[in-house]
Amino acid sequence: ILPEMFELLRDLPQDIIIVSGQEVPKIAWQTSELSTIRLGQNGNHATEADGTELWNIPLDDAHRSEILAHIRSLMEHVDHDINHEWNPIEDRGAQITFSPIGNIAPVEHKKIYDPDRKKRMILLEKVPFVSEDLVVKIGGSTSLDYIHKDRHKGTNVAKLIKLKGWKKDDAVYFGDGLFPSGNDESVIGVIDTHLVADHLHTYELLRKFCTEEKRGIV
């Protein structure tokens, strides 16, 4: 997280929620232990800012087997050698993530691997994922996220809002996956959403949002 982003979020009086495909401990690390509610694995593992667990709903073994079989089929169509040292498959509990280049590939490699998402879309066109209970979404810069079709970011954001007794009209969501088949798409229609390109764009929009709020515009 950018130091200026950390300071901006830290000083906000509103509740901050990080919704991510990553595991909760990694969210904490990536955000420099910023005090936030954390919805990891597309919201299927939720914790309070102090670490108190709100819920955790992992995939079952049958679903894991179904996902891994599809990933193995996808691997046959990847147009390069897969570097297994870069962890192409991560089982995060409630979510399994496949990155053809590797989940822990260097950032500079990830940035140029599939910026327009076409490589991943072509893979899914070649090997469609057909499941009664599961879906796959394009997530992050290089990954495909497999989750339960009824337990995605949209349902989990709504679940948290209901649990906390908040008003949906008071909530706003910033995401880079607010497009068809994106891993933020399910939040559209749940609360107000704003599409961002990357972390720098997120910072600029948040800074503008906070400035306008102070002026009474928002």
Q: Where is each model-derived feature located?
A:
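A structural signal for isolated positions on well-ordered beta-strands in alpha/beta enzyme cores
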Residues: 15-17, 37, 97, 172, ...
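Residues at the C-termini of beta-strands that transition into short coil/loop
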Residues: 39-42, 140, 197
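Conserved acidic, metal-coordinating active-site core of Asp-based
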Residues: 82-172, 180-183
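Mg2+-dependent phosphoryl-transfer enzymes with acidic/Ser/Thr/Gly-rich catalytic loops
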Residues: 149, 153-218
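Short glycine-/acidic-enriched loop or helix-start segments at secondary-structure transitions
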Residues: 27-29, 50, 108, 183-184, ...
